[in-house]
Amino acid sequence: MPERGRASAGSKAADVGGVGAVDAAAVEAADVEVGVADVLAAQARLRSYLPITPMHHAERFGVMLKLENLQRTGSYKVRGALNAMLAARERGDSRPVICASAGNHAQGVAWAAYRLGVPAITVMPHGAPENKIAGVAHWGATVRQHGDSYD
């Protein structure tokens, strides 16, 4: 196991401003199946935190649109972030959270952390849109800029 803040040889991991390293190969090797019970559990967790967003029939295209842009963060990405943090809380895990994102996921993590009173760090690449950085900072998350891309 690599030391905290150091990448093991050959891994795609990085020390990000002293917050530690994540081994990308280990993350990719995690095989997770999501079933109906998982979806229903997530729905139950999120019910009291997020509004039900409306559906809109776009007749011209023959599709239904779920208006997740009406979430506080402007994106559906808050759902996954909040669900993960609530599930961690159910397991008794109240550690700070960290994510890597250039925008919507980072804002979702920041809002969820704010709502749950959990410290959050978002790692965003240099060149991330200023409005996304400001959105993350607005919810109180620490923004660390690292690298020039998502890789």
Language-model features, listed with the residues they occupy:
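PLP-dependent amino-acid enzyme catalytic core
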Residues: M1-D151
